[in-house]
């Protein structure tokens, strides 16, 4: 969800977006043209709202006649970077669930053209051919160009060997477009494995991540989301999707 700062792909996140210059506009979709007999997920227009002391990006998701609200939130300082103009984050976050349950996806807001092309032409065909559990679904959406952004570069910091490797490789290199500006701690499903201890475990990991951020002189962005509870999945198999949310 954090493609809005706009984090270079070291972090993945699609919820964070471009900088300023955003046309606040609703995008209409002609649902009458869609096959009515197919099971589908409808991603309504995302919106930004204040929730307690956080900035929250929310989209109502219609599934088989019921509606679930999916949200992603950050500190208000980063609220302007949340991306309401595209359905990108929600498409990626729900793609695995949709393929496993045989639901096509319909988006009210546009999807970035390059992303929709890669998912439709390469990712879905490859996944559906490699696993009988994943259906070759359709995504119906208008396309739009990539949004301008603040050119930030971030990566997740779990304090595991992989995240430290990325940190070491990109904290100071010769490529400005890939030089880290932020570290990120997301909550998109991994902490459910700790059940009743999940809150305590997450708070301890945030403190540890903050120590690392302070030590290397980078800002830490802490996000939260209900994606895992709104659409329960096995995080071990789906983290590649949810981590890009």
Annotate each PLM feature.
Residues 26-39:
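Short, Lys/Arg-enriched N-terminal segments with co-localized hydrophobic residues
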Residues 37-152, 166-226:
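RNA-binding accessory domains that recognize and position tRNA/RNA substrates
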Residues 9-10:
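Intrinsic disorder
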Residues 219-245:
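Conserved adenosine/adenylate-binding substructure
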Residues 21-22:
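Glycine-biased, low-complexity coil/linker segments
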């Amino acid at each position: 969800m954090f493609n809005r700062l706009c984090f270079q792909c070291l972090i993945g996140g699609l919820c964070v977006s471009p900088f300023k210059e955003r046309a606040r506009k609703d995008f209409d979709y002609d649902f009458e043209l869609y096959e009515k007999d197919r099971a589908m997920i409808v991603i309504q227009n995302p919106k930004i709202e204040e929730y307690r002391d956080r900035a929250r990006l929310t989209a109502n998701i219609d599934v088989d006649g019921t509606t679930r609200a999916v949200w992603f939130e950050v500190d208000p300082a980063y609220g302007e970077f949340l991306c309401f103009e595209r359905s990108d984050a929600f498409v990626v976050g729900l793609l695995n669930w949709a393929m496993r349950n045989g639901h096509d996806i319909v988006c009210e807001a546009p999807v970035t053209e390059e992303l929709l092309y890669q998912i439709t032409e390469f990712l879905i065909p490859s996944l559906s051919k490699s696993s009988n559990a994943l259906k070759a679904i359709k995504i119906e959406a208008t396309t739009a160009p990539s949004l301008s952004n603040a050119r930030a570069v971030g990566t997740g910091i779990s304090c595991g060997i992989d995240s430290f490797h990325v940190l070491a490789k990109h904290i100071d290199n010769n490529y400005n477009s890939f030089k880290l500006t932020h570290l990120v701690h997301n909550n998109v499903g991994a902490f459910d494995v700790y059940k009743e201890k999940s809150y305590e475990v997450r708070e301890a990991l945030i403190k540890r991540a903050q120590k690392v951020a302070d030590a290397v002189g980078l800002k830490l962005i802490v996000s939260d989301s209900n994606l895992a509870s709104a659409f329960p999945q096995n995080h071990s198999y789906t983290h590649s999707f949810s981590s890009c949310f």
